[in-house]
UniProtKB/Swiss-Prot annotation:
It comes from Zymomonas mobilis subsp. mobilis (strain ATCC 31821 / ZM4 / CP4). Heme chaperone required for the biogenesis of c-type cytochromes. Transiently binds heme delivered by CcmC and transfers the heme to apo-cytochromes in a process facilitated by CcmF and CcmH. Residues 29-146 are periplasmic. It comes from the Bacteria. Heme binds at H123, Y127. Keywords: Cell inner membrane, Cell membrane, Cytochrome c-type biogenesis, Heme, Iron, Membrane, Metal-binding, Signal-anchor, Transmembrane, Transmembrane helix. Belongs to the CcmE/CycJ family. The lineage of its organism: Bacteria, Pseudomonadati, Pseudomonadota, Alphaproteobacteria, Sphingomonadales. This is Cytochrome c-type biogenesis protein CcmE.
Amino acid sequence: MQAKHQRLILGIIALAAVIAAGFLALVAFKKQAAYFFTPTDAVKAHLPANRNIRLGGMVERGSLIREKDGVTIHFRVTDGYQKIAVSYRGIVPDLFREGSGVVADGHFDPSGSFTAETILAKHDERYMPPVTQQQAAATQTTLQEK
């Protein structure tokens, strides 16, 4: 009877540990989750300051300003309807440029400006490096000549 009692207590402790671990994982995931918003969605949502989100859209042409320190940039993200000013301090991806797609991971400050901790430059699925484009063009020309 005592062995049965010990197994029951051990089972209850193991179940409690699994539930506690699951709860802690859920809380940690919720804190790390960053939802994707377009500028229009972000304006409509009236997001609280310091809530991490992913802001996606196009870098507005003529909005990119580089600071003299070489690592800070300011630009506007637009979806064609709304524009949101973004500040970022860090290394800029090679594909980042005006008129291209971008996803900025960060938060709104109490002043209402968006501070990005990371930025991802997006490209369309048809992107090919210049060398590959040249090789494809040469192959196409060769095939047309035959």
